[in-house]
Amino acid sequence: KTNAGKKNLPDSVKILRLWIDHGQAPVDDTYGYTVYTGKGTPSARLPFRVLRNDSLVQAVQSADKKLLQAVFYPGNNGLQAGGVSLAASEPCTVMIKMVAGKSVFTVTDACMNAALKKITLTYNGETIEVPMPQGEFCGRTASYELP
């Protein structure tokens, strides 16, 4: 009932809550999850490919290769998979979407480091400097279009 008393919002909504117990001390365990929205049973064939899923980089790419999403954690050594080479100078999230034949990059400094002025990406050998939002906009996404 978080919306109780607020105009134009429902008092309550149904949400998904999920708890998965991996035990007290899992060692060298690997797992991944896919959450689908909507009604019905999803296709057994995933609409994406997991490029990497470890403690340094998590990345997926759509089956049609028009969308790539990656999370780079501290100490990461970049991503080399699925015909893609992508590295980031700082921990961040990166989305690359193909739009009208151009690569559109959306980058977020998830750490909200106010001192961070830019994140440098290396994408298939090309260096891209993405200025990070400053001041009150720190933590917002920044976009860059590669012609």
Predicted regions and their residues:
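Beta-strand/loop-rich accessory regions of lumenal/periplasmic or secreted enzymes
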Residues: 1-25
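A structural signal for short secondary-structure junctions
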Residues: 10-12, 24-28, 99-100, 112-113
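Short beta-strand micro-motifs in enzyme catalytic cores
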Residues: 14-16, 29-31, 58, 103
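Short Pro-Gly-centered flexible turn/kink motifs
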Residues: 26-37
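Non-catalytic terminal regions with compositionally biased, polar/charged low complexity
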Residues: 36-147
